[in-house]
A protein has these predicted regions:
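Non-catalytic terminal accessory segments
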Residues: 1-124
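Membrane-interface segments at or immediately adjacent to transmembrane helices
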Residues: 119-181
């Protein structure tokens, strides 16, 4: 198990180094002070994921732990999408289709995806699916109303107020059965 975590953290840092080097190439014309500031911000974000993971069992104030969790997990997703976008532009360059603004386009696409995902996370919605099951019941009962919820992320990801909102949304459906997944 420790080997798995070492490999996972190594991949995470390799991805961040790849993003950092690509960003350094894209920002070559910027003043030194701007580069230093962006480097400090970048590595603070990159290390926040590791920090939030290591601080899980400590007695941090809830606000600090929640903030570290939000930044750390957000940075993990940022790293994933940014690396994928940068690889696409590097493949273009490999096949002699260089894109001068590949880093900036990757950054824009990644931040757009993160913003879209965060908005949807903060504004949960309900969807209705009617599923017909061709099975006779013992009693000729009314249709069963099932509510399925997933990706709630209890803990530092979802606080008590957000959980209360989810419970109200679920109860408003008046379900016969609640399924909780993920």
């Amino acid at each position: 198990m420790p080997t798995f975590f070492v490999v996972l953290i190594s991949i995470y840092f390799a991805g961040n180094i790849y993003i950092f080097k690509s960003g350094a190439q894209a920002l070559v014309a910027q003043p030194f002070g701007v580069k230093v500031l962006l480097a400090v911000l970048f590595w603070s974000g990159a290390l926040s994921f590791i920090g939030s993971f290591l601080a899980r069992n400590t007695q941090l104030p809830v606000v600090l732990a929640h903030t570290a969790h939000e930044i750390g997990t957000g940075w993990l997703v940022f790293t994933l999408y940014m690396v994928l976008c940068l690889i696409v532009f590097d493949l273009f360059r490999l096949f002699n289709f260089p894109c001068k603004y590949g880093f900036y386009i990757s950054l824009f696409l990644t931040l757009s995806l993160l913003s879209y995902g965060y908005y949807n996370y903060q504004h949960p919605k309900t969807e209705v699916f009617n599923i017909v099951i061709n099975k006779q019941t013992v009693h000729n009962e009314q249709p069963l109303k099932v509510v399925s919820v997933s990706d709630i992320h209890l803990g530092y990801g979802t606080d008590k107020e957000e959980l209360k909102q989810y419970v109200e949304m679920i109860n408003a459906q008046k379900p016969d059965l609640i399924l909780i997944g993920g």
